[in-house]
């Protein structure tokens, strides 16, 4: 009874704090509250509080159940939210270099934890005895590595999606300006005097705004470079976790089912996801094709991760069906 009450309290504390943090980020984006001393730093400290709250929640379920809390979908979602809070700690303790991770990790943590604690999972499952298929020392190794890999890959993929959005906004007006120039050439014979006046006026405006335009383009370039850098770093880390998780799962499968690989739906999608991010890392080694191309591959991997993570859980089939919605 005490553990249930403590778990309930820690769940609400972590969710409330991360909700406040997300609100602070949203207000900062709207009204530029960075100028207020200490306001933005308090949001970072809020994620640290959330990290310890989720950590306490996981330890409470661990002590109460007697096994590592990764036996169902609810516990895996809480652990995934914990993984995002760990990634956020990187930006918190690395203040020398601004990396924009907090804009990705805070909304992701609140979305995942909100989904886990909502009524979409029917109810929050109580800690129970493991099913025979999960009673193994490989549970902590395999599932934790997979979830940590999912968290890092999702975060890196979201950074790549942000890179694509910023790049699209950068190149979009360029094509629009080219079309304007073409239309001006068509009408130049009829409105030469008017165009001459407009061009003279525009040249003055361009001289006045040249410094502002240069600083804005330079900031956008720096932002794209940072997003590309951190996307590569985090996806590389997630790829290592995913590889270790797949290999440990293969060893566990051989001990339980007598074969290393069975082409189970979860295994198949995990292999597809691993292949996509292997292609991403290969593209990053080629200076001629990296950039937007690698970001597109990472964005594709973002969808594949959710298919791999929730696909079997929605269908409730295969050897991994014990973590499905129906089992909760």
Swiss-Prot record:
Entry's transmembrane regions: 13-33, 46-66, 73-93, 101-121, 146-166, 234-254, 263-283, 295-315
GO molecular function: heme binding
Main location: plastid
Subcellular location: Plastid, Chloroplast thylakoid membrane
GO process terms (BP): cytochrome complex assembly
InterPro entries per the UniProt record, alphabetical: Cyt_c_assembly (IPR002541), Cyt_c_biogenesis_CcsA (IPR017562), Cyt_c_biogenesis_CcsA/CcmC (IPR045062)
Bilayer topology annotation: Multi-pass membrane protein
Function: Required during biogenesis of c-type cytochromes (cytochrome c6 and cytochrome f) at the step of heme attachment.
Protein name according to UniProt: Cytochrome c biogenesis protein CcsA
Organism for this UniProt entry: Arabis hirsuta
Taxonomic classification: Eukaryota, Viridiplantae, Streptophyta, Embryophyta, Tracheophyta
Gene name of the encoded protein: ccsA
